[in-house]
């Protein structure tokens, strides 16, 4: 029987700056998994799954939590649960993951139109940005009134200023709008800003809190909100095919980092990002946005830098990149930081002689690398995806 | 039995600049209606309906046409018919009617995401605008690849430059994208630019050609495309509830203006608009876009003009307005043009003393007029809708 | 320029038993149309459209009415308006038009699953039929709870017994379910049973009341319900592309028969159907259901009768048939009744020698007639559709 | 801080006859998990996930496989991937899980209507059942043509006769219809009938093969089909929120039983079921269908047995039941078999004195158990769901 076509064995995320989703389960997590509960979570009978849900809900000051296998699932069922009867639309940042990277779930599941807004300050949406794009429910039968504002914290690695969130929340309450947070990296926002999850919980009607990114769990997220909201979201989770059976092991492994000193782990990854940002600034390498937390976004357009060259320069130094976004996480080593500095500056120098104009909606160019890198070293095919 | 609560009798559109949909059936049309065929169009057995469909299809150089009761119906079933299997998205101008004023049909019927693009030149989308926002189908499972470009001609009253359309069409064909045209006012574009409908027909895979706006028919539009496209669109028309029975009278009345000198009628309405635009420019009243055809868009934001005051000033001179868009059509009189000049300049002067900052997505503010206008004259409630 | 490919001129519905939608506008209607109002109904400014809506609403004892271009449109927007947030399902008769002949609108517009029930008595659903198929909302996340019961009166020409409707209504109210009526032929039910429309209005939360079938109007229906319901339905009507402009003529023509002695007209058509039913029974020709009103359903399966032969036998006597359903309406002549008796009995005799077993979901076989009928007479291609 | 409200610790599935989803991970599986790969499966970089997918695909003779977190997810994305452009419908058994227990996914994700068919033989759909309910694509714009037949093997524990599947497949190919199999218990069908998975793979275009039911894995299923099909299904999996990161452990644990002697394990569970079926028959306790494999369906309606009493009688003997379906799996002990015999016969005797008429669409009554069982023993609340 012919051999399976298997990918190469994934050894470590220590040199993987493509995304913080590459964090790998630790030995401590594996040990914990052996003790996990074995109930069927669809029937609400798995202890560790319930413990995880209530732990994260309590941290966010919410009545209930729902374990979901991905952030896309928790975002999309949260938005669907807030929306009642169309025609309606949701408003979000034009870079929001719910709009750009969740494969049209908003249209398919929620039948929702989207008003994607470019922040006037370039970094995050202000209340004024929202008010000037919000579609009021004034009885106009042509329209699709805005029913929900979906924000992302962090977005593009930027920490959402708390006072702006408070202003937006007050206005939402006055206008009967729901406020959801894609908290794929809300742990990073909390760690960096010192704002406790509970305070974010007071602002947002629901938060999708990812576990498998900076927090290092194998899979999943927890969607938090009030009891009625989570009960209905559970129905949508089943409808989406997200109802899973013995999830105890996955829940127990996620609880390990939650019960550890996650703030220090995350702040370590932020420090690497801050250092790289300073390095770039010193070198005149333009960045897209302030590197508040674990991401550094190299402005490929302004630098006229070919993302494919950047990826290959990374490989030259045995560092994995996917494009303009450099994603630090707690498993990245200082050695990798030093190497990525070299890769970026060489790619920047290369761009000065070979300016590249990428004309696509995102700075990330699907890197169809050839067999040979710029320096002639053989490279296996890299399947890189947009961040 | 209590009397019905009926609206006031609508007498004439001569002074109605709210929209060109207010054009009223002419005596000639009424006469024609008496001779109309009486077959059941759902079974394809109504002569005048088939005659209208084939007349307009032939004018646009297309194989077939489908009579629809509204432009929203023909636009939405056209887009649905071009789209096969989600996840996908369509790309259009951020002001496009299919996106802003068709009550989320794109999400509900077609499960489509929308990439609304702000034209870099402020007037119409260039090929570069499209290429820099187009989502390629590169296998990225996060995305919703662009499958269709939907343009509008005219949009905001602006005639789409033919050469730009030709460039966009060539690129669409290279990239396997369909190109639809919301031709609510394509007659206006053709009349003003001299580009025959047939040439537009060569560029667009489908065109929704409205009959009830500048062309003065009571209801409807004709969706033109190839035979296979129209056959499938017929199925979606029935699904949307748009299959109608004895439509002969409506078809026959639409054919009257199509067989008349429609170009002169439209060019007359354009001349009124051009004259108003010049008047405004002379007075320093800012406009949003060039008044190529029958619309003049007063830039309420730049003029800091309260649309509600503008509407009431119009009523003072017995001219009906809905906000910043002044919509001429062939039934508007020169007398109305003179009166609307006065109304606009008084509203502009009023704004200099009472600057108004409208913070909404459209310049049109839903005019909740009081019982009394600015000059004390009693006014019945106006139900005005966004243009 | 080549001639248009036009269908033959449709002269009269006097011999057309395919469907009561073939009723043609009368001279009286054409006269009335000349006096019709000319306002834009999307803005609520057309007098005759508002008059039609309030007339029919008042007849049904409802707060408001909404003119729609087809029964499919009013049925589908009614059901969508009653449904709030999925997952949910509606329950109806397995032969219901909303389920079998509205091109999947329930799934596309309303995202609704359907529980189609076969009536235990073979004619209409009883409360027990409904209770034994109803999906309770008991928190089971696997299910799609029943939110709405959609009944049809008449269905298959059968008048729904009032007392059964009253029982079903009471149970619906106890269980928080909405009750919609597809009233494509509710006029026939009212005329035959003597139950006033107003009494049906007390039972059903909404009724889609067709105008273009037995009532002979060119197009449309009126959806009646409470004010809040109709306001939201208007939004869905626009979304479906059903918002039409100068609909005064169509409204005025519909009002003609409403203000005439429509009961006598309908009872005349019922009398023809009753006579044909008695004729069939006397001949041993099996019927599918009691011919309460204007339909006679020949049981093709039991009679082992080929619908294609029946259609062609009809043509032999210049009578148009589409299959097992014989649809009488007030424009059918007694002469046509006598001829269809001959056609049916000849087809029945033919079946005795050429038994035909149609194995399709409906008794109607899409009649791909050849150029020559059974008796050798040349026949134009008939495009017949399922009833 | 108040204690969490945790469910009781789930110890063993040995006495759990509610569903075979309650099978718990074995020590062997836990050991295997420790060696699992740690790549990110969204990027196709996890070795064990790819190995699982290719193992199951190869067993079913298919080009590719896709690991999904649930059978609902793999069923719904399979059906969506086969369907191109609505309006369309799918045809299935009225008891099919895709129709009754996947929370309206067919309407929400696929916009599909469903034709649920009652098998004429009471057990499984024959080709004739399908042909007499299939909606042909004959151009009828009222309809929603059948595009896909979704069968379930086993369904209701019944093994689908191979020759019937072969007949159905041939007819589907003639009529251009896709054929999907919900293989939640296809392992049971294969074990019992001796038909290899590969032969089922030749018949069905796609099969959703569950791992977490009789095969005992913690979560998931593998959807198998051709390469193009699986590539598109991957896009829908991401859209549904089913893209998960480090799934190596879950994949490795599923491979344990696949690489063990699963047939013996399953046949053991079947033997228990057969024994119970014989016991019931001997006692005159009516069954709904032949107990071919691991399920015994007590006909509650015919036995006039209250499912709530049955559940409580089970608890009296420390055996967990959810209603009429008794689900055996390889972790159930002979002791449990003996006890469930007692529970069922006592409930049956109880029914003779207290006949119960359950009037709901399914024989399973949501068991709102009181604090005390029929024999006075205190019982914790059971959250039982429909099978």
UniProtKB/Swiss-Prot annotation, chains A, B, C, D:
Q: Cofactor(s) for this protein? A: pyridoxal 5'-phosphate
Entry-annotated residues carrying Phosphoserine: 367, 369
Task: Give the pathway.
Answer: Amino-acid biosynthesis; glycine biosynthesis; glycine from L-allo-threonine: step 1/1; Amino-acid degradation; L-threonine degradation via aldolase pathway; acetaldehyde and glycine from L-threonine: step 1/1
Keyword set includes Phosphoprotein: yes
- Biological process (GO) annotations? glycine biosynthetic process; threonine catabolic process
Single GO molecular function: L-allo-threonine aldolase activity
| Enzymatic class | lyase
Keywords of this protein's UniProt record, alphabetized? Isopeptide bond, Lyase, Phosphoprotein, Pyridoxal phosphate, Ubl conjugation
User: Which sites are covalently linked via Glycyl lysine isopeptide (Lys-Gly) (interchain with G-Cter in ubiquitin)?
Assistant: 228
* In-chain residues carrying the UniProt-annotated modification N6-(pyridoxal phosphate)lysine: 213
Q: Which Gene3D superfamilies match?
A: Aspartate Aminotransferase, domain 1 (3.90.1150.10), Type I PLP-dependent aspartate aminotransferase-like (Major domain) (3.40.640.10)
Q: Does the keyword Lyase belong to this entry?
A: yes
Q: Which residues carry this modification: Phosphothreonine?
A: 370
Q: What does this protein do?
A: Catalyzes the cleavage of L-allo-threonine and L-threonine to glycine and acetaldehyde.
Q: What else is known?
A: Present with 106000 molecules/cell in log phase SD medium.
Mind telling me which NCBIfam families this protein's record contains?
Answer: GntG_guanitoxin
Quaternary structure and partners: Homotetramer.
**Family designation:** Belongs to the threonine aldolase family.
Name of this chain's protein: Low specificity L-threonine aldolase
**Species in which this protein is naturally found:** Saccharomyces cerevisiae (strain ATCC 204508 / S288c)
- Tell me the organism's taxonomic lineage: Eukaryota, Fungi, Dikarya, Ascomycota, Saccharomycotina
Gene that encodes it:
GLY1
């Amino acid at each position: 029987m012919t051999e399976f076509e298997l990918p190469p064995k994934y050894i470590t995320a220590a040199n993987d700056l493509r995304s913080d989703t590459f964090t790998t389960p630790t030995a401590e997590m594996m040990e914990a998994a052996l003790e996990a509960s074995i109930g069927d979570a669809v029937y609400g009978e798995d202890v560790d799954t319930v413990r995880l849900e209530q732990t994260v809900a309590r941290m966010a000051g919410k009545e209930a939590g729902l374990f979901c296998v991905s952030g896309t699932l928790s975002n999309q069922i949260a938005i669907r649960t807030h929306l009642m009867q169309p025609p309606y639309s949701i408003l979000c940042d034009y870079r929001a993951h719910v709009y750009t990277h969740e494969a049209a779930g908003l249209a398919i599941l929620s039948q929702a139109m989207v008003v994607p807004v470019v922040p006037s300050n370039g970094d995050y949406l202000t209340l004024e940005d929202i008010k000037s794009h919000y579609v009021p429910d004034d009885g106009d039968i042509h329209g699709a009134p805005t029913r929900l504002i979906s924000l992302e914290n962090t977005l593009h690695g930027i920490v959402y200023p708390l006072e702006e969130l408070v202003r937006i929340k007050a206005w939402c309450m006055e206008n009967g709008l729901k406020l959801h947070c894609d908290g794929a990296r809300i742990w990073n926002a909390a760690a960096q800003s010192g704002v406790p999850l509970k305070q974010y919980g007071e602002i947002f009607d629901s938060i999708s809190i990812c576990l498998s990114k900076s927090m290092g769990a194998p899979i999943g997220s927890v969607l938090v909100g009030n009891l009625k909201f989570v009960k209905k979201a559970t129905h949508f989770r089943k409808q989406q095919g997200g109802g899973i059976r013995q999830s105890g092991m996955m829940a127990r492994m996620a609880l390990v980092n939650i019960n550890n000193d996650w703030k220090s782990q995350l702040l370590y990854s932020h420090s690497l990002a801050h250092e790289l940002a300073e390095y770039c600034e010193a070198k005149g390498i333009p960045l897209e946005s302030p590197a508040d937390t674990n991401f550094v976004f190299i402005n490929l357009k302004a630098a006229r830098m070919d993302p494919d060259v950047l990826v290959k320069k990374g490989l030259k130094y045995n560092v994995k990149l996917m494009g303009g976004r450099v994603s630090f996480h707690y498993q990245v080593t200082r050695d990798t930081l030093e190497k990525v500095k070299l890769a970026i500056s060489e790619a920047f120098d290369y761009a000065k002689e070979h300016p590249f104009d990428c004309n696509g909606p995102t700075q990330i160019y699907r890197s169809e690398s050839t067999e040979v890198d710029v320096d002639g070293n053989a490279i296996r095919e890299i399947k890189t995806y947009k961040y």
